[in-house]
Amino acid sequence: MKLAESMYAGPAHIGTLRVASSFRNVHAIMHAPLGDDYFNVMRSMLERERDFTPVTASIVDRHVLARGSQEKVVENIQRKDKEESPDLILLTPTCTSSILQEDLQNFVNRASETSTSDVLLADVNHYRVNELQAADRTLEQIVRFYIEKTRAKDPGSPDPGGAGRRQASSSTESGTEENLKGACGGEKTKKPSANILGMFTLGFHNQHDCRELKRLLAELDIEVNEVIPEGGLVSNLKNLPKAWFNIVPYREVGLMTAVYLEKEFGMPYTSTTPMGIIQTSAFIREMALMCHEVYNNSSTKCSQTDFESCLISNTKKVPKTYINKQTHFVSQAGWFARSIDCQNLTGQKTVVFGDATHAASMTKILVREMGIHVVCAGTYCKHDADWFREQVSGFCDQVLITDDHSQIGDIISQIEPAAIFGTQMERHIGK
């Protein structure tokens, strides 16, 4: 066991609840003892939203231990179904209540018989994954559930998944056209469009990043099809395959969903994080290539005139022209890199630590765009260690993969860097 103070990523049920509470009209029921039900207070304090956090704790007490949980869990699901009328009720245990080894899937099946809402059990191993891994898995599970539900309602529709699998073994033109059709036989959007996967509650600057992504896509004449899970409706998940491609801003959450959609519908995706001038340039080029791939291989209703009117239509000229304009006349990144504040750090030693996405991107920005010496770059995402090492290789002297705050504290005290780019924990260490 670890003290909550020393944890970079929380237990698995926190990730599941973050995804559930990000969707609109979704209610989560947490099967847990007293002490595990702090998510409501934490989210209300940090997000400061007007609405109540849609999470109910089904408390495991002495009566439950004596008689079993089924009656209480089913009763709570049915009560919330009548009171809230949510589109989806998500049941999740915690690592503590998992010790009871109860058949929660049976509870869900029983509650589903009398509930008008969909009822789903979060399929997460609470002893093997952390908060971020559980969030990634839960989002993919919810998307899979509603796409399969839509297919089951319309069994006569074409099977894009089958077409996608056929395309892997056969490059026939008809297979390609079937594969690139939208949800359950629907067509792609007329204009180039994208889904943004992985924006959710309590995320690090997720709202600001989403706003900037939407602005970037609008300037490139790319429509936003769906943003999930933050502010999304589960009833709209069937529309995900209508987009031309998927954007995964953060590897931690959304990557499994993008891989699933690629496998089932042949939808390309990019997991390049547009942080910094160089990575934003690569991000724009990837989007241009994906748009051309879909336009050339699919039966979209986008006319050649409409497509060529989009800024993204010229894969060679547009990214270079757009990026040069943004760098020299719009963005202040180049100005900041030459400012006194930044030049004071030029050649100085720094330490970077955080989640894999932000730590890797920040390391590259500091080295390539600001000329700052990164002595140590690290992440607490141990499950993504190989990718992180590959990304920061050649940009730092030392790579640290750990979720123990004392190790990064020791390294900071040894190096004595001029600046620390890290989490709240590193802020306390630096003081």
Swiss-Prot record:
Its main location: plastid. The active site is at D341 (proton donor). It comes from the Eukaryota. Keywords: 4Fe-4S, ATP-binding, Chlorophyll biosynthesis, Chloroplast, Iron, Iron-sulfur, Metal-binding, Nucleotide-binding, Oxidoreductase, Photosynthesis, Plastid. It comes from Chlamydomonas applanata. It catalyses: chlorophyllide a + oxidized 2[4Fe-4S]-[ferredoxin] + 2 ADP + 2 phosphate = protochlorophyllide a + reduced 2[4Fe-4S]-[ferredoxin] + 2 ATP + 2 H2O. Its EC number is 1.3.7.7. GO terms for cellular component: chloroplast. Signal peptide: none annotated. It holds the Pfam family Oxidored_nitro. InterPro entries: ChlB/BchB/BchZ, Nase/OxRdtase_comp1, Protochl_reductB. Coiled coil: none annotated. This is Light-independent protochlorophyllide reductase subunit B. Pathway: Porphyrin-containing compound metabolism; chlorophyll biosynthesis (light-independent). The keyword Thylakoid does not apply. It is found in: Plastid, Chloroplast. GO terms for molecular function: 4 iron, 4 sulfur cluster binding; ATP binding; metal ion binding; oxidoreductase activity, acting on iron-sulfur proteins as donors. Its cofactor is [4Fe-4S] cluster. Binds 1 [4Fe-4S] cluster per heterodimer. The cluster is bound at the heterodimer interface by residues from both subunits. [4Fe-4S] cluster binds at D36. It is an enzyme of class 1 (oxidoreductase). Protochlorophyllide reductase is composed of three subunits; ChlL, ChlN and ChlB. Forms a heterotetramer of two ChlB and two ChlN subunits.
